[in-house]
Structures are given as structure tokens and as C-alpha cells.
Design a protein with these regions (language model features):
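Short, Lys/Arg-enriched N-terminal segments with co-localized hydrophobic residues
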Residues: 1-7
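Short, surface-exposed, charged amphipathic helix/loop patches that serve as local interaction elements
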Residues: 9-100
């Protein structure tokens, strides 16, 4: 039954769209200087399962979170560690749901 298959595919497709959380963007009120460049926003790409597996061996919560933020934002771990705490806390809030 072709109609049944199309309906099923549409239902699955709708679920995929609903399940996609997307990339997260943090806009900075005061630009951050990183590597000599002025940063006005930080984008964290939505982690995939392989990204979560890549940090699952890290037992320290802070190190695991910093590593995931670095992996998904394009900044190095050292750069993330130099971020002001208030910016790190906002970034942590964006990735924390994936680390539960």
C-alpha cells in the first residue's frame, strides 16, 4: 500500500524535524578577543552521538564540558579556559543537556 508508506515516511520525517534542536548561538554584549580576533558571537553546533562518545571517557565534569564546547565551537581548549566565567557558564548551559 503506497499511501500507507508515504504517510509513514511523512510521520518519520516530521519527527526528525521536531527532534532537531539545532545549533546554539551565544551573542556577546561585549566582544571577546580570542587569538587577536574580536568575537561577537559563539556558535555551538549540536553534538552528534559520536561527539558525546568522544568525551564520555572524561570523568571530570568540567574537563568534559570544556572539551565538548571546544569540539563543537571551533575554539581550542586553552581558548575556552581563558573565557570569562560568565561566558563559560552560559556555554555550559547550552551543552549540559547533552551530557546528562
Amino acid at each position: 500500500n503506497k499511501k500507507g508508506k508515504n504517510k509513514m515516511a511523512k510521520t518519520i520525517e516530521n519527527k526528525k524535524v521536531a527532534a532537531y534542536l539545532g545549533d546554539a548561538k551565544l551573542e556577546l554584549s561585549t566582544p571577546l578577543i580570542v587569538g587577536g580576533k574580536e568575537i561577537k558571537e559563539i556558535v555551538i553546533k549540536e553534538p552528534k552521538v559520536k561527539d558525546l562518545k568522544a568525551v564520555s571517557h572524561i570523568h571530570n565534569d568540567l574537563d568534559r564540558t570544556v572539551t565538548l564546547i571546544a569540539n563543537k565551537s571551533g575554539f581550542t581548549i586553552d581558548e575556552i579556559e581563558d573565557f570569562p566565567t560568565h561566558i563559560y557558564m552560559k556555554l555550559q548551559g547550552l551543552v549540559e543537556p547533552f551530557l546528562r
